[in-house]
C-alpha cells in the first residue's frame, strides 16, 4: 500500500484529499497534519472528511508522524510548503505540491530539493487542465503571431493569489510556444486610457466571486474568428484525484522535479 500523508488536512482541500486517498486502490491515508494550534488536533481524519473513523488522528507536528508515510501531499501556502519541503528533503520523503503563489526564487528551492527527493509540482492537478496545456501549445504554434491572446480566470472569494497559478502556467505555455518571455509580455488587468493593444502582449483578467471552483479560458482572437480553449472545474475532487494519481506514479521514481505532464505522459 502507498502510504500517503495530507498536510492542511482540516481545510477544504485537505478534506477532499483525504477522501480521494481513501477511494484510490492501493493507497491509504496514514498521516494527517494541520497547524499545531488547531483545535482539531487529535480528531480522527476520516471523521473530519465525513468518511467515518479511519484510525488516523490529526497531528500538529509533521516530525512526529515522519515514520508513518512515504509521500506527502501539500496544497497549503508557500511559506508552509517550503518548511515541509525542507523537512521532506532531509527525511527522504517524496512530495506532491499543489500550492500556488511561489516567487521565482521560491520555485528555485523546489528545483534544488528535486536533486535529493522525487517531487511532483503542478499549478493544477486536473487531468483536463493538463490536456488543455497540451492543446494550448499546439494552438499557439499554429495560430502564431496572427492573434491577440487573452487569459481569463475565475475562482471563489477565498482564493488569495491572482492571477491563479493555472492561468500563469497557461500563459507560460503559450509564451514559450511563441518564443516570448511571459514576464516581459504579460499585462495584468487594464484601466483608464490604455491605448491600442500591443499584439505581442498576453493579457490576464481575474474574477473572484462566490464559490467558483475554477474556470479558465484562453482566447486567441484574430480578425474574423476566435478560438477559445476553456476548462471549468465543478468540484475540488478533480484536483484531489489528480494529486493522488501523481502520488501513486511517483512510487519508485528517481529524485527530480516532475509535473503532471510527466505523470500523464504528455511531454
From Swiss-Prot:
Give compartment(s).
Cytoplasm
E.C. designation(s): 1.17.1.8
- Membrane spanning residue stretches: none
- Look at the named UniProt entry and state the broad enzyme category this protein falls under: oxidoreductase
User: Main localization of the protein?
Assistant: cytoplasm
Which reactions appear under catalytic activity for this entry?
Answer: (S)-2,3,4,5-tetrahydrodipicolinate + NAD(+) + H2O = (2S,4S)-4-hydroxy-2,3,4,5-tetrahydrodipicolinate + NADH + H(+); (S)-2,3,4,5-tetrahydrodipicolinate + NADP(+) + H2O = (2S,4S)-4-hydroxy-2,3,4,5-tetrahydrodipicolinate + NADPH + H(+)
Matching entries from NCBIfam families are given as: dapB
Protein purpose: Catalyzes the conversion of 4-hydroxy-tetrahydrodipicolinate (HTPA) to tetrahydrodipicolinate.
Give the matching PANTHER family: 4-HYDROXY-TETRAHYDRODIPICOLINATE REDUCTASE 1, CHLOROPLASTIC-RELATED, DIHYDRODIPICOLINATE REDUCTASE
Descriptive protein name? 4-hydroxy-tetrahydrodipicolinate reductase
